[in-house]
Amino acid sequence: MPARMSALPVDERGYPVPWFVHWSDGKPDFRIMDNVKRAVAVTQRKCWLCGGQLGRFQAFVIGPMCAINRVTQEPPSHKDCAIYAAMACPFLARPHAKRREAGLPENIAPDNGIALLHNPGVCLVWIARSFFCYSVPTPDNPRGWLIKVGDPVETLWYAEGRPANRLEVLEAISRGLPILTEAAKLQGREAELELAKAIDQVRRILPPPLDGVPDPDLVTVGEGGTNALKS
């Protein structure tokens, strides 16, 4: 555990409680982010996980679909805090783990944007120098907003608490890509072309190829035909 996270409170199981976690009746609910702290994190440049001051670089813990659209709900963290979360968080580290929805407070606002509720099986620590926030109002959450991450200076893929290999990442992308593809189709040809471009950019940050293991084809609509996410 990073030293800067050692001052965090722990729950009854002994797990450190990240700074962003919502507390109810004196107990942390790891499923819910504190929306006040979410705003403080971006306006005061606080680490999403430890609450300390961020420096020049920001590390986002995101899933493979967020790597494609470069959009996330969660503010950035220190690099070492983000890596610890990617390796130690039960939901992120265990591909078959599921979020518990039972008993969620009724006053919790729905997530902004298109939520991908499945566990992708891999996560990515996306390290950048910049990000910006933009408004995403919905009928249920008129003050909703999301974060667009800047170009990465470093990317680190993880699965099962260790560095992920290329095939694991590609398989995770294949599970979520149909959702983005259908959303792009509804928005029209320009959105489909933008998606193809975004997928091509993700290809450049995949883990290295595995000896003797070909990449699976991940095809989306592109200008003049189709584009496959392959090396």
Where would I find each of the regions flagged by the language model?
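Short metal-coordination and nucleic-acid-contact micro-motifs, chiefly zinc-binding Cys/His arrays
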Residues: 40-44, 71-74
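N-terminal alpha-helical interaction blocks
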Residues: 1-41, 110-231
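Eukaryote-specific, cytoplasm-facing alpha-helical/coiled-coil scaffolding segments in long proteins
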Residues: 101-110
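Cys/His-rich metal-chelating microdomains
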Residues: 50-53, 84
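Short cysteine-rich clusters marking metal-coordination/redox-active sites
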Residues: 47-51, 78
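Short linker/helix segments within small regulatory modules
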Residues: 63-75
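Short, non-ligating residues that shape and space the ligands of small metal-coordination modules
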Residues: 54-60, 87
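Short metal-binding segments enriched for Cys and/or His
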Residues: 75-97
